[in-house]
From Swiss-Prot:
Its main location: cytoplasm. This is Protein Rv1078A. Encoded entirely within Rv1078 (pra), on the same strand in another reading frame. The lineage of its organism: Bacteria, Bacillati, Actinomycetota, Actinomycetes, Mycobacteriales. Residues 35-82 are annotated as: Disordered.
């Protein structure tokens, strides 16, 4: 087959690279067929307890009104729990 000019529609179709996800999947599948490494799910890091931001940097926000607390509980004498 002669070299197709790049603007030719067929050339556009053939030159589009394989979607990378698809390429990875086929590679892993081939591995498994060959007895190689089985597909490892991309491991999510273990969800540790989310660290609360340091209390000094927590913005002073109004209290949750559903608890009916007055104003900003950070600086109120009653504290977070009445």
């Amino acid at each position: 087959m002669s070299h197709l000019p790049l603007h030719h529609p067929a050339a556009v179709v053939t030159l589009r690279p394989l979607r990378p996800r698809a390429a990875v999947a086929t590679r892993l599948r081939r591995h498994r067929l060959a007895g190689g490494p089985t597909r490892r799910l991309r491991r999510r890091p273990a969800v540790t307890r989310r660290r609360r931001p340091d209390r000094r940097f927590v913005r002073c926000r109004p209290s949750p009104t559903r608890r009916g607390l007055p104003g900003c509980w950070r600086h109120s004498s009653t504290g977070p729990h009445t």
